[in-house]
């Protein structure tokens, strides 16, 4: 029984790596997503771009409003806004694209064989496009002063900011792995869990690093505003943290496989099922 299940699991993982799976409506299995495949992939990319756009627009926008209008939002309000917009976009587009919204999350899913590598550059491009468009929108809407910069820069030491980014990004991916890729989890609550994680992370690390957790979230405003101070922190930190979070959850996931098999395959349990695929997100 166990051997047969393992064979099915490996076959499902192999199909994901080759870009094969259910079509857009969860029907016939064909290459990539078909009917036709290009249309389906385009829908995913549009969903990723729109989701990332509104996450950056809302999260960064509330920062600008808070500075320009005398602190009317307050720091707790900023934290809640980030958590809510991520949750809303997961439930809005997760069933279409998987709701990554984060290049580090996309790369991590690919590393652990949860996402086809050939779609990674396209997803990352869509995410950066969404962030750039949102940043341009905010610059056009508001007179953004240097004090109202809506990107991310270390409040003190770059080293402290880097450590903070690694830790909170680790937590983010650990939660995503638990609620969105483990069949034992309640998939319908994934959006709430991820949104609350974002909110808590902003509360804790916001005053230290700005709580990015997402290279696209930081690079978009940096490019639009021309502020690149310690931008490397917001690329290295989230990537290291997210990959580490996914790897650790994979190690502690219950399985009857020996540890050497887990570290060899580095796979996330089973292939993503339609009921869980829409919840695999982040900021």
Curated annotation (Swiss-Prot):
It is found in: Membrane. Keywords: Acetylation, Membrane, Phosphoprotein, Repeat, Transmembrane, Transmembrane helix, Transport. It comes from the Eukaryota. The modification Phosphoserine is found at residue 267. PROSITE patterns: MIP. A motif (NPA 2) lies at residues 214-216. Gene3D superfamilies: Glycerol uptake facilitator protein. GO terms for molecular function: channel activity. The modification N-acetylmethionine is found at residue 1. The chain crosses the membrane at residues 45-65, 70-90, 122-142, 161-181, 189-209, 231-251. A motif (NPA 1) lies at residues 102-104. GO terms for cellular component: membrane. It is a multi-pass membrane protein. Its main location: membrane. Disulfide bonds: none annotated. Aquaporins contain two tandem repeats each containing three membrane-spanning domains and a pore-forming loop with the signature motif Asn-Pro-Ala (NPA). Belongs to the MIP/aquaporin (TC 1.A.8) family. NIP (TC 1.A.8.12) subfamily. Potential aquaporin, which may facilitate the transport of water and small neutral solutes across cell membranes. This is Putative aquaporin NIP4-1. It comes from Arabidopsis thaliana. The gene is NIP4-1.
């Amino acid at each position: 029984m166990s051997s047969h299940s393992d064979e099915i699991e490996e076959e499902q993982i192999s199909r994901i790596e080759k870009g094969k799976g259910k079509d857009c409506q969860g029907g016939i299995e064909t290459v990539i997503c078909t009917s036709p495949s290009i249309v389906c992939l385009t829908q995913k990319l549009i969903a990723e771009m729109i989701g990332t756009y509104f996450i950056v627009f809302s999260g960064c926008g509330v920062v600008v409003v808070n500075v320009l209008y005398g602190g009317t939002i307050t720091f707790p309000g900023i934290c809640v806004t980030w958590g809510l917009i991520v949750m809303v976009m997961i439930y809005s587009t997760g069933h279409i694209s998987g709701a990554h919204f984060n290049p580090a999350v996309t790369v991590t899913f690919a590393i652990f064989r949860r996402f086809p590598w050939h779609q990674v550059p396209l997803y990352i491009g869509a995410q950066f496009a969404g962030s750039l468009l949102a940043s341009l929108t905010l610059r056009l809407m508001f007179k953004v002063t240097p004090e109202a910069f809506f990107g991310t820069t270390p409040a003190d030491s770059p080293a402290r900011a880097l450590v903070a980014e690694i830790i909170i990004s680790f937590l983010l991916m650990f939660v995503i792995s638990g609620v969105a890729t483990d069949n034992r989890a309640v998939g319908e609550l994934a959006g709430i869990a991820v949104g609350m994680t974002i909110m808590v992370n902003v509360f804790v690390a916001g005053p230290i690093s700005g709580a990015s957790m997402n290279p696209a979230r930081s690079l978009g405003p940096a490019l639009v505003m021309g502020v690149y101070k310690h931008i490397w922190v917001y690329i290295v930190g989230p990537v290291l943290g997210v990959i580490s979070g996914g790897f650790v959850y994979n190690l502690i996931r219950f399985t009857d496989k020996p540890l050497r098999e887990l570290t060899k395959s580095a796979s996330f349990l089973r292939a993503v099922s339609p009921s869980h695929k829409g919840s695999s997100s982040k900021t």
